[in-house]
Amino acid sequence: MEIEDLDGIMYRLHSSIVKNTSSKAAVDMAVYDLYAQRFGAPLYQLLGGAGDTVETDITISVNPVPQMVADSLEAVQQGYKILKIKVGKEGLADVARIAGIRKAVGSGIQIRVDANQGWTAKEAIRIITAMEDKGLNIDLVEQPVPAHDLDGMRAVTKAVYTPILADESVFSPEDAAEIIRTRAADLLNIKLMKTGGIWQALKICSLAEMYGVECMIGCMLESKLAVSAAAHLAAAKRVITRADLDGPSLCKADPFTGGPLYENGVIRMTDAPGIGITRVPAFV
C-alpha cells in the first residue's frame, strides 16, 4: 500500500489484531511520520496546525508531605507552572498533601490531582469537597474511581464543582462516546498508547468537538519518540486544552535527537517534516 492511502493502512492495522493498543500505536506513529514526510511538512500542520507550542504539567509522586512540597518547589524552579499531584491512597490525608503543596507554591501555580482510580465514589465526593472547602483551587481531578465504575464517576462529576477527567475509563472512541452520552466526566484524557495511535485519537477529538467536551493529551512513562507524536496532536487540535506530556522529563536519559523542543514546561514544535525525530538509537 502507498503511504498516501492513510485510511487504508489504518483500517488494515486496526482490523489485524484485537487490543494491543501500544503495539498499534507504534505502527500508527511511524505511518503518520512517513505520511507527513511525504508532503514535507511537520505532522501538526497536516493535522490542523492550531498552534506551535504546548504547555505541559509535570508529575509529583506520592511521598510524605515534606518531600512532595520539595519536589513541587523544584519543579516550579525549573519553570513548570502546572503540577499534577498523585494521590488516592490515604483519603483525607491526600487533602493535607494538596494543602501543603498549595501553600508552598502559591496561587499562581496550577494544580491537578490524579487519583489513579484510588477512591470509591463516596470517598471521592468527600475528599474533593474538602479540597473545595479549603479553597485549594484544583484545575481537575483525574480518574477518581475505578475505570469500570462509570455510574460512580458520574455521581462524582454531578456532586462536585471541580472538573473530573476520565483517563483509564477511555481507551477508544466508543468509550469516549459513552462517557459523553452519560455525562460521566467533564473532560477526556487521550493517550496514544490507549487509543492505538493518532488515527483513533482523532476520532475522539472529533466527538469531543461535536459535544463541547475539552480533552487532555497524556502519556505513560514514555520516551521522546512517542511523546513527540502526542505533542504534534496536541499542537494541532484546539479541543486539546491541557497536556500531561512529562514522560521525557522523567526519563534518566534521552537517546533520541530531533523532535519538539522541551523548555521549562513548554514544548515547542519545529519545522522538521513528520514527527521530527532524526536519530533513533540501536537498542541491544
Please tell me what each predicted stretch does:
Residues 3-7, 42-46, 138-144, 219-220, ...:
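Flexible, glycine/charged-enriched surface loops at secondary-structure junctions
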Residues 1-38:
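Metal- or metallocofactor-binding catalytic centers and their adjacent structured scaffolds
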Residues 85-226, 252-262:
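Catalytic core of soluble alpha/beta enzymes
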Residues 37-64:
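N-terminal small/glycine-rich loop or linker at the start of catalytic domains
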Residues 220-284:
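Flexible C-terminal active-site loop/helix
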Residues 52-56, 75-82:
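Gly-rich Lys/Arg/Thr-decorated short loops/hinges at beta-loop-alpha junctions or inter-strand turns
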Residues 35-36, 157, 208, 234:
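A generic structural signal for well-ordered alpha-helical segments
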Residues 41, 60-69, 74, 91, ...:
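Active-site beta->alpha loop and helix N-cap motifs at the rims of alpha/beta catalytic domains
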